[in-house]
Regions:
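Short acidic-glycine loop/turn motifs at beta-strand connectors
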Residues: 52, 63-64, 213-215
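Short alpha-helical segments enriched in small residues
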Residues: 68-280
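Accessory alpha-helical/coil subdomains and C-terminal extensions
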Residues: 1-53, 58-60, 68-73
């Protein structure tokens, strides 16, 4: 027993666990549908954990050594990358803000924020990352209409014509924040966080996001169907950080409409931008 059976049993019980966490943009239901087949593997295993505006895929391998476990996790992670593409934005990080800051650092870029309904939440998330002072210097909280005009150059006539919660205002906020700060990238948010303030055209949960780089603003509309103030603000901040990441990576953010800086006061261009989102 001591010389043969016991050593054999101990050897069979000896194993190491290694884990790798993929951070994925988007909701859980859509993600689970896309990767369902990969969640049924016995070793490595994979499980989805839902967060606001994103998910974690935790891959865990059981192996004879940590090195072997890492290789197994890495090989299995490639299957998720192949299936999900750049929806997988990073590995083993605390959150999207960490990836945004690190990407800006790697690219030698800076960022500014212009926030209304999020009230500084985007800036708070960015500055929670150690070293963020290298890339983030200006955060404008422009809750009042006059603050939007004074601090980031939103035209009061644009607010009056299109509403403060609109694509033209989000575009002007982003372009204005970039100009006022001198940052390479600027993101903006204007919306109705609730529980009051909505109407038929812009119900509670309606948010417009802007992101500007190289003289072009990219605008996106977000609608959070559950009228929960904290959730609307959290989802808006997450979506703004996603726009920032794509611009930092040199990509055009998906599902956005562009407005050039040269057209920020062009009535026809602003009306076309506004109409695009209202039709949707």
């Amino acid at each position: 027993w001591e010389e043969s059976v016991r050593p054999l049993l101990l050897a069979r019980q000896s194993y190491a666990l290694h884990s790798l966490t993929l951070r994925v943009l988007g909701g859980e239901s859509n993600l689970e549908y896309r990767v369902r087949a990969l969640l049924e593997n016995p070793n490595p295993t994979a499980a989805i954990y839902c967060k606001t505006g994103e998910c974690e895929i935790r891959i865990t391998a059981r192996a004879r050594s940590d090195e072997d476990g890492e290789k197994m996790c890495r090989a299995y992670a490639k299957k998720f990358y192949d299936m999900l593409g750049d929806a997988v934005y990073d590995e083993d990080v605390a959150g999207l803000e960490e990836t945004v800051v690190h990407t800006l650092q790697e690219k030698g870029l800076t960022i500014a924020t212009a926030e209304s309904c999020t009230g500084g939440l985007i800036a708070q998330r960015l500055t929670s990352v150690s070293g963020s002072s290298e890339v983030f210097g200006y955060g404008f909280v422009t809750y009042w209409e006059q603050a939007k005009a004074k601090l980031v150059g939103v035209d009061p006539a644009v607010i009056e014509k299109y509403n403060v919660v609109s694509a033209p205002v989000a575009a002007q906020m982003a372009l204005g924040a970039a100009k006022a700060s001198g940052a390479d990238i600027a993101v903006s948010v204007t919306g109705v966080a609730g529980p009051t303030g909505g109407d038929e055209v812009r119900p509670v949960g309606t948010v417009y996001l802007g992101a500007a780089r190289d003289g072009v603003a990219y605008v996106k509309k977000l609608f959070v169907s559950r009228p929960d103030r904290a959730l609307v603000r959290a989802r808006a901040a997450q979506a703004a950080l996603e726009l920032a990441l794509r611009l930092a990576q040199g990509k055009v953010p998906a599902d956005t409409q562009a407005l050039a800086k040269s057209a920020r006061h062009d009535a026809a261009a602003l009306t076309a931008l506004d109409s695009t989102f209202l039709k949707g």
